[in-house]
């Protein structure tokens, strides 16, 4: 886009990674260690796929979803997924990191039931100790 005359800036903090293993792995943003090294007041919300009705019904309940947030601003710093269809679930977390969403904003996103994506909302609620399935 820049070569065509547009003035665009790339946010490398919001570039997802995907590993096509079994289970799949997907990640965007900072991990816990990186967030601590950068001086953030790190808060973590974690949701296991063993608590996901959809993952259990699929017979693919191995793994978890983890959200890393800044405790002082509630901003989402990173989201990491190990589990079924992680590479398909990472776009929504990528948007949250790119848009600098807060955990509270992200947790208010409605996820259809039963879906694997519900784990995203549950992990956000877990940051504030509000998850209902764990």
Locations of the language-model features?
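Glycine-rich active-site loop/strand segments that organize a redox cofactor
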Residues: 6-11
